[in-house]
């Protein structure tokens, strides 16, 4: 591990109404609470009905769009998406489907990863969405990090958060802000990914 170079954790997300982006920023804050770690916040562009990128190269707001270079350079990954019928949103799936070269080269193998999501309703498919995002990460050979019940907020939350990852219940009007426990759990998830990335780097991968 290079003592002068920070370990970068890629926080990669798709967000339509802004709630998943809010979670991503909290995860990134948790990453940067770990000494020697830095978060790289990136989003994926929307896709058109014909399943191709449907946005200019530079987003109008939010984080820059992700590239394959971001994946190869990261020491850990936190992946976020709103739910779409209990699954990840199409733009994130489209991006992940394009990572065959990284899979073939093992670029992500042996790196820690975590997932986060937001839904409009309490039972709108949070856990199935989190699990759907884990599948490609397992194919990439990543170490999955969740949220254990040693995190006090997981016992207190009446909104988002589960052992599978951080989450947020946005409400049917997409208006509520992240709750206190949701914020706490998102930051805890970022810390856990970053801490494992540091341990793996110190151990030589």
Question: Where in this protein do the model-derived segments appear?
Answer:
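Short, glycine-/small-residue-rich phosphate/pyrophosphate-handling segment
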Residues: 109-159
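Glycine-rich phosphate-binding loop at the start of an alpha helix
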Residues: 131, 163, 180
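Mobile beta-alpha loop/short-helix "lid" or hinge segments that flank ligand
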Residues: 44-49, 141-173
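N-terminal beta1-alpha1-beta2 submodule of the flavodoxin-like/Rossmannoid cofactor-binding fold
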Residues: 1-107, 169-205
């Amino acid at each position: 591990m290079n003592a002068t170079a920070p370990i970068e954790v890629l926080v990669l997300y798709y967000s339509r109404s802004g709630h998943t982006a809010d979670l991503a920023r909290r995860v990134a804050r948790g990453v940067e609470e770990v000494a020697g770690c830095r978060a790289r916040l990136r989003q994926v562009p929307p896709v058109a009905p014909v399943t191709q990128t449907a946005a200019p190269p530079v987003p109008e707001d939010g984080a820059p769009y992700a590239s394959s270079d971001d994946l190869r350079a990261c020491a850990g990954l936190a992946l976020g998406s709103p739910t779409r019928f209990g699954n990840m949103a199409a733009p994130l799936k489209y991006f992940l489907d394009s990572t065959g070269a990284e899979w073939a080269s093992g670029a992500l193998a042996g790196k820690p990863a975590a997932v986060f999501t937001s839904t409009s309703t309490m039972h709108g498919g949070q856990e199935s969405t989190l699990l759907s995002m884990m599948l490609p990460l397992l194919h990439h050979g990543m170490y999955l990090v969740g949220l254990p019940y040693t995190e006090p907020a997981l016992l207190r939350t009446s909104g988002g958060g589960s052992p599978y990852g951080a989450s947020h219940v946005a409400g049917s009007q997409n208006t509520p802000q992240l709750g206190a426990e949701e914020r706490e759990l998102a930051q805890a998830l970022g810390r856990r990914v970053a801490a494992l990335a540091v341990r793996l780097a110190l151990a030589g991968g």
